[in-house]
Amino acid sequence: MAVKKIAIFGATGQTGLTTLAQAVQAGYEVTVLVRDSSRLPSEGPRPAHVVVGDVLQAADVDKTVAGQDAVIVLLGTRNDLSPTTVMSEGARNIVAAMKAHGVDKVVACTSAFLLWDPTKVPPRLQAVTDDHIRMHKVLRESGLKYVAVMPPHIGDQPLTGAYTVTLDGRGPSRVISKHDLGHFMLRCLTTDEYDGHSTYPSHQYQ
C-alpha cells in the first residue's frame, strides 16, 4: 500500500522543518504534533493538520497517529544535553498509538553514536545518547516495521539526494546535510528495503 498520510513528530526541529517541507512538496498529507504552532513556518509548505500538544501526553499522540499510513520520528532536545526521557517516553506513546490504529511503519532518527563503541561517546552527549538508546530499544522491540536512521553530524549543506546509505554500520563520511537526511527519511516510506535495519546516511560534500 502506498503511503499517503503521515505523521511527523519533531517537525519544528532543524531536520523536522526540512522533512516537513519536502513531505508536503512530495504530495504527502502531513499531520504534525507541536507544542507551539508558532514554531511552524508562516510561509512555504504547510502541514495539512496541526495538533497542538505534547508527545508525552498519550491522548495527543493518539490523535496525531489516527488515520495515518506511516510515522516519522525526529524527536530531539534541541541544545539541552541534560538527562532526559522525552524521546523514549514519546516513542512508547507513539508505538501504543500505532498499534491502536493499525499503523505499522515507523522511521525514526537517533544518531550514529548508537553504531559506535559506547565508551567513545563524548561525555557531554552521553545523557541524550542514553535516551536515544532507550528509544531505539522501544521501537526495535515493538514488532512494527521500524527503520532506524542513525546519522552522523547533521550539517546545513544543500540537498543533493546523492548520499550513501550504509546498513548496520558506519559509512564513508562523517556528515549528512539536514536536507538530505529529510530526503532519506521520506525515501524510507517508499521501500521496505530498510525495514529492520540501522541505516547510516552520509555524503562527501564539496
Swiss-Prot record:
Any GO BP annotation: negative regulation of insulin receptor signaling pathway
Ligand binding (NADP(+)): 10, 12-15, 35, 38-39, 54-55, 75-76, 78, 87, 109, 132, 153-154
Substitution effect: residue 188 to R: Abolished S-nitroso-CoA-dependent nitrosyltransferase activity
Keywords recorded for this protein, A-Z: Cytoplasm, NADP, Oxidoreductase, Phosphoprotein, Transferase
Range of residues in the leader sequence: none
Gene3D superfamilies documented for this protein: NAD(P)-binding Rossmann-like Domain (3.40.50.720)
Catalysed reactions, semicolon-separated: reduced riboflavin + NADP(+) = riboflavin + NADPH + 2 H(+); bilirubin IXbeta + NADP(+) = biliverdin IXbeta + NADPH + H(+); FMNH2 + NAD(+) = FMN + NADH + 2 H(+); FMNH2 + NADP(+) = FMN + NADPH + 2 H(+)
UniProt xrefs under CDD domains: BVR-B_like_SDR_a
Protein name, UniProt field: Flavin reductase (NADPH)
Organism per entry: Homo sapiens (Human)
